[in-house]
A protein has these predicted regions:
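Extracytoplasmic small-molecule ligand-binding "clamshell" domains
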Residues: 21-105, 109, 113, 172-179, ...
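Extended ligand-binding regions for polar small-molecule ligands
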Residues: 20-26, 64-73, 132-154, 200-202, ...
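A ligand-binding cleft/hinge motif common to bilobed small-molecule-binding domains
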Residues: 87, 103-113, 160-165, 186-221, ...
């Protein structure tokens, strides 16, 4: 019985993921009436693939889309504040700088953080993030392994509990720079650390962004995930709970889950194996589409492999579709839909890429211009222009992608940089750097096979 009580205490004392605060701080009393007078609902969040991000100039994120639907129902504009230091989320909430925390929060005892949790919007177990290949297959294999986690996170507490529960010695390392979980996943993918822990919902998204990771080892039972609110926001909590309890049973929520967690890109077959005289399943289509465009068909093929693995029926995160993953609004602009033929999709893609290429006509070197085009296709032009301005400030060349703007775009995840006045579009995860690099790896491989 004593062991069971210790277990319950360890579970309930799971804190919000790095959202620490000073318990002596008094919170501002702000509820729905004042929010309505202010005329907007403010969400404090992280720049992550699950909570909030911008992709191809569209605001996305599983939690963002839930709260966007809620705000529309309340007839309130939604304002997003990205907080780079996750340990400040609760402080900013209590200070009245935002009304809701959206950061994939595990539900814990409210008095641990002195905030309230909404009704859960999802539940997800914790899983081990490791690289493919020499992976471990059981929790016992974590003995003597080094696992990096966020300070005071539910992941740290879970690993400590596993040590006591099954008698193993895990070398738990707290990453001092206050990263978000996705930063640690990226470090695993790059081989800089071997293991970290994440909730399975974020891990499912991440394994399609980071090709080297495995997320199959489950470390816990499903944990409830919710939004965080001030204690004083009684009416806001009542309205949001009512909305969530209805929304999670709706077809709209079912479709939202499909778009983020069950999309087909993650279940594509093994990469097409080039055969003699044929590099891809659609060589002739690629060759036909690039005629008179100045583009190498192998480069367009590399984009298609990276985007969909040559699957014209692929559906991606946020609703993207097709062989080169058009966002729905962009597809409508270019006259295509998920039912369009491969050649129609490629023709539209070529028009889009050629138009984007024209936007970068001040880049003198053609290869570099192509890389800027690919980067803006992935991230949206605004983030890449931010990276150019930042590159200039850092004494890098704003007209060269390799080792210059490429470096600057990675710095846009850091608040020391994305809060600079020259940065117009805010925080960005930096995925464009990896996107461009991967496409050129595929492209160079195709050229070597010629």
């Amino acid at each position: 019985m004593l062991i069971f009580r210790v277990f319950l205490i360890s579970v309930f004392l799971v804190v919000l993921q790095s959202c620490s605060y000073n318990p002596d701080e008094k919170e501002k009393s702000i509820d729905l009436d004042e929010i309505n007078r202010r005329g907007k609902l403010i969400v404090l969040t992280e720049n992550s693939s699950l909570s909030y991000y911008e992709y191809r100039e569209k605001k996305l994120g599983f939690e963002y889309e839930i709260l966007d639907s809620f705000a529309k129902k309340m007839n309130l504009p939604l304002e997003i504040k990205v907080v780079s230091e996750s340990d400040k989320l609760v402080k900013y909430l209590k200070d009245g700088e935002g009304d809701i925390i959206a950061a994939n929060l595990s539900v814990s005892l409210s008095n641990v953080q002195d905030i309230k949790f909404t009704s859960p919007h999802y539940s997800s177990p914790q899983v081990l993030i490791q690289r493919k290949g020499k992976k471990i297959n059981s929790v016992q294999d974590l003995d003597k392994k080094t696992v990096y986690v966020r300070k005071n996170s539910s992941f740290q507490k879970r690993l400590e509990y596993l040590e006591d529960e099954i008698g193993i010695d895990i070398n738990i390392k707290v990453y001092e720079e206050d990263p978000i979980t996705e930063d640690l996943i990226e470090l695993v993918d790059e081989g800089k650390i071997d293991f970290t822990v994440a909730h399975e919902n974020l891990a499912r998204i991440s394994k399609d962004l980071y090709e080297n990771i495995d997320v199959s080892l489950v470390l816990s039972f499903p944990q409830k995930l919710a939004f965080g609110l001030r204690n004083s926001s009684v009416d806001l909590k009542s309205k949001l709970d009512q909305f969530l309890n209805e929304y999670i049973r709706s077809e709209a929520f079912t479709q939202l889950k499909r778009r983020y967690f069950d999309y087909a890109v993650s279940e594509l077959p093994v990469n097409f194996i080039p055969k003699k005289g044929k590099l891809t399943p659609f060589d002739k289509s690629f060759q036909n589409v690039v005629k008179n465009s100045g583009w190498d068909w192998k480069l367009l093929a590399a984009i298609a492999q990276k985007e969909s693995n040559f699957n014209p029926q692929a559906r991606g995160m946020g609703g993207s579709f097709g062989i080169i993953q058009f966002m729905p609004a962009t597809g409508r602009k270019y006259g295509i839909s998920p039912s369009s033929s491969v050649e129609q999709q490629l023709i539209a893609g070529m028009k889009l890429l050629s138009s984007s290429m024209d936007d970068w006509n001040k880049i003198p070197d053609m290869t570099q211009r192509v890389k800027f085009t690919l980067a803006s296709y992935n991230a949206g032009r605004c983030h890449i222009e931010d990276a150019q301005r930042l590159a200039k400030k850092l004494n890098l060349n704003p007209l060269i992608w390799d080792g210059n703007v490429e470096k600057a775009v990675l710095k846009l995840r850091n608040s020391n940089y994305y809060r600079l006045p020259i940065v117009k579009c805010g925080a960005y995860r930096g995925h464009a750097a990896f996107y461009v690099r991967r496409i050129f790896e595929i492209y160079n491989g195709y050229k070597a096979m010629n």
